[in-house]
């Protein structure tokens, strides 16, 4: 079977890393990129050099309005570059880009993202939470994808992708009565380098490199959309911290069935080695955040950081590269829906 042809709208952090993940995984073919704010020579530069993930271990050049991305042992990608501000005006069909990754952060509703369908795309995957598009988390609920009705879908958030696999394993084995999540989250592009105005969210406007910033996140509540039996049982918040990448979920839950920490470790390890292999990982090492830069998993369970007050009340800790792990799941989700017709 031929590989799915993919277009990327928005060549920012996630757009570029989706392309890196696509090259590395070699399961989809990227045929187009649209970004109205970046010239093609600048795209080459931004893709080649990355302060967080390092220099691209291959070659990237351009020929006319095509990006050429190559890496030894992997398929090469000849990528048509568009520069349209209007998603409806991008000629995805001209390069047979059936699947479009919407990674601008702007067109996150079904109505806005469906503009890509006018240009010839068949499916749109929003690389962010969506207010109304169905959300799929690979390894958790991706098999509920409905090819005949789901033309615009969301890959949820990086934090939901970390939390949901862990919550599913714990809920399936022990039952979750209720829980609170905190994500200690790396900085992202929406934050300020120094103090500045930030609409109604005043704290978000404080200097990202100087502060631990409490922030809201819908990631825990979104798990209830992905795992319906947990709807209304989880909520959470975030602390933005001055690190460039890698975040960590702290999930504190009350369990229906009592469980020792060893019981919990066993079921998480079984899932990581079995049905969630490649999505959920498991470590007993004395790790810190930089150990997970460029880690392709959604969630890496840290046994040494977990604690238990009693067999029904536990705190569980799981790491994630909020950029690269998430981008890998975007590619996996496309690979899956491409097989569903």
Curated annotation (Swiss-Prot):
Residues annotated for D-glyceraldehyde 3-phosphate binding in this entry: 157-159, 188, 217-218, 240
Q: Which Pfam families match?
A: Gp_dh_C, Gp_dh_N
Q: Biological process GO terms, please?
A: glucose metabolic process; glycolytic process
- Keyword Calcium included in the entry's annotation: no
Where does it reside?
A: Cytoplasm
Q: Which residues form a coiled coil?
A: none
Keywords in alphabetical order, please: Cytoplasm, Glycolysis, NAD, Oxidoreductase
Q: List the pathway annotation.
A: Carbohydrate degradation; glycolysis; pyruvate from D-glyceraldehyde 3-phosphate: step 1/5
Annotated NAD(+) binding sites: 13-14, 35, 85, 322
The answer to whether keyword NAD applies is yes
Q: Which GO terms describe its cellular component?
A: cytosol
Task: Tell me the domain of life.
Answer: Eukaryota
UniProt lists the family membership as follows: Belongs to the glyceraldehyde-3-phosphate dehydrogenase family.
PANTHER family under this entry? Answer: GLYCERALDEHYDE 3-PHOSPHATE DEHYDROGENASE (PTHR10836), GLYCERALDEHYDE-3-PHOSPHATE DEHYDROGENASE 1-RELATED (PTHR10836:SF65)
In Swiss-Prot or TrEMBL terms, this protein is called Glyceraldehyde-3-phosphate dehydrogenase 4
Which species does this protein come from?
Caenorhabditis elegans
């Amino acid at each position: 079977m031929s590989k799915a042809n993919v277009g990327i709208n928005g060549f920012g952090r996630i757009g570029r890393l989706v392309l890196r993940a696509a090259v590395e995984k070699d399961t989809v073919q990227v045929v187009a990129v649209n970004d109205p704010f970046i010239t093609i020579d600048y795209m080459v530069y931004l893709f080649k050099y990355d302060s967080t993930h390092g220099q691209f271990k291959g070659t990237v050049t351009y020929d006319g309005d095509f990006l050429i991305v190559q890496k030894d042992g992997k398929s090469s990608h000849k990528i048509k570059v568009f520069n349209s501000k209007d998603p409806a005006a991008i000629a995805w069909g001209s390069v047979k880009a059936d699947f479009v990754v919407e990674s601008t952060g702007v067109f996150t509703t079904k109505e806005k993202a469906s503009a890509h369908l006018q240009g010839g795309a068949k499916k749109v995957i929003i690389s962010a939470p969506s207010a109304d598009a169905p959300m799929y988390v690979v390894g958790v609920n991706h098999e509920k994808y409905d090819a005949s009705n789901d033309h615009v879908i969301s890959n949820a958030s990086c934090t939901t992708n970390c939390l949901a696999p862990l919550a599913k394993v714990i809920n399936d084995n022990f039952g979750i009565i209720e829980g609170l999540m905190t994500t200690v989250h790396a900085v992202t592009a929406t934050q300020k380098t120094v103090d500045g105005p930030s609409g109604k969210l005043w704290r978000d406007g404080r200097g990202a490199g100087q502060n631990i910033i409490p922030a809201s996140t819908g990631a825990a509540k979104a798990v209830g959309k992905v795992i319906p039996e947990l709807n209304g049982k989880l909520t959470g918040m975030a602390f933005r911290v001055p690190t460039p990448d890698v975040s960590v979920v702290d999930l504190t839950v009350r369990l229906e069935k009592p469980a020792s920490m060893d019981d919990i470790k066993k079921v998480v390890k079984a899932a990581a080695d079995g049905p969630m292999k490649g999505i959920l990982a498991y470590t007993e090492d004395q790790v810190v955040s930089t150990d997970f830069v460029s880690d392709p998993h959604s969630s890496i369970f840290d046994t040494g950081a977990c604690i238990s007050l009693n067999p029904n009340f536990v705190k569980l800790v799981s790491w994630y590269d909020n950029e690269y792990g998430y981008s890998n799941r975007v590619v996996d989700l496309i690979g899956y829906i491409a097989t569903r017709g």
